[in-house]
């Protein structure tokens, strides 16, 4: 009984790897977001699509947040692809645009890190 309780507490204590990413996106915080980037990150943004180092990715996201600050950022769905891959589909709404955002994570050294962020504009 004690072992089951201990395992349950361990599972409950584990943070969802998307929590700091969601907080960073909601707060337009490129620095915090980049702390979840893998060594390289693929960013597919409206004006810019490429693979960047984590530090370059931070600058790209900082510019994006400045141009398109979020009015809201909402997670629509999260899921597990396999034991080392997770995804989230989100809505990113600005004052005059709405994007569907797909975030892909991959487990590296016991931590889930961002492999790719893709923004697709939703047509109204």
Residue ranges and their predicted role:
Residues 14-29:
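Short, aromatic-enriched amphipathic alpha-helices that serve as compact interaction elements
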Residues 37-39, 47, 77-79, 91-94, ...:
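A mature extracytoplasmic/lumenal domain signature
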Residues 32-34:
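Solenoid-repeat scaffolds in large eukaryotic assemblies
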Residues 98-124:
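Short beta-strand edge/turn micro-motifs at domain boundaries
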Residues 37-74:
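Short solvent-exposed beta->alpha transition segments
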Residues 10, 70, 112-115:
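Hydrophobic, well-ordered secondary-structure segments
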Residues 59-97:
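Surface-exposed, charged secondary-structure patches
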Residues 1-17:
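Bacterial Sec-dependent N-terminal signal peptides
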């Amino acid at each position: 009984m004690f072992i089951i309780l201990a395992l349950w507490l361990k599972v409950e204590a584990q943070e969802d790897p998307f929590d700091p990413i969601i907080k960073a996106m909601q707060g337009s915080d490129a620095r915090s977001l980049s702390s979840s980037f893998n060594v390289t990150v693929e960013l597919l943004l409206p004006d810019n699509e490429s693979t960047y180092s984590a530090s370059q990715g931070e600058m790209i996201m900082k510019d994006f947040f400045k141009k398109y600050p979020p009015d809201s950022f909402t997670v629509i769905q999260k899921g597990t692809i396999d034991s080392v891959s997770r995804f989230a589909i989100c809505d990113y709404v600005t004052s005059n645009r709405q994007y569907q955002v797909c975030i892909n994570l991959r487990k590296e050294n016991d931590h889930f890190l961002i492999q790719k962020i893709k923004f697709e504009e939703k047509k109204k």
